[in-house]
């Protein structure tokens, strides 16, 4: 049978010891794997349970979610291919095969590709930038971060066309695109991230509800813009937007398809 155990949110040393103990108790000789994924765990729970059932108690998966990031701790008997099934099932969701944050993985890929990053944030208000510069050595690959919160800052600092904001609004595909384009045109960067949206609790409408977010990620070759409506309070919407933006940048740097249709995040 499969056993479900709630682990602590940071998988601290006591939790690792507990995890190892459970592995010996339940499985005897076993392997431990960590998989980092992007997406709500509710969307994945049934498929994870199916993987556990397929191995008749030879594999156990412990999930923990923070925002849109899910950490899977996989225990399985030595030689059991359960973790391979996890990779196959959630390939588009996985961003790391070790316990590493989105921002850290993003910087690692910038280093490997020898690329520089610039960020323009509206609703996220510096959350992406702050998270990135928590990492030592970020200055080697992180060039610039702007909080362009007002319409005038978007037009003055990023060269967003005032007519675009007038016709489509600050929260739109078009504005997000121009924000990223402004970074690429004016900044010293190879890849750009831009966010604009309605964090709430006020400011929403029928056509543009609270939680509506546009995220642009691009290079000099192409800019992709993604639309999402994130649920939750103001902080949760901002966190989800920040995490999604970094995940998209990771996918772009890894040359993965940016078709997001198969990944549910809200």
Description of each model-found segment:
Residues 1-25:
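Proline/glycine-rich low-complexity loops and linkers
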Residues 4, 17, 50-51, 79-266:
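Short alpha-helical segments enriched in small residues
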Residues 10-13, 41-43, 122-128:
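Gly/Ser/Thr-rich loops at beta-strand to alpha-helix junctions
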Residues 25-43:
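Short glycine-/aliphatic-rich beta-strand segments at the starts of folded cytosolic domains
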Residues 36-39, 72-78:
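Short beta-strand-to-loop capping motifs
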Residues 38-60:
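Short amphipathic alpha-helix segments
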Residues 56-62, 190-194:
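A short linear hydrophobic-aromatic micro-motif
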Residues 65-69:
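Short Gly/Ser/Thr- and Asp/Glu-enriched loop/turn motifs at secondary-structure junctions
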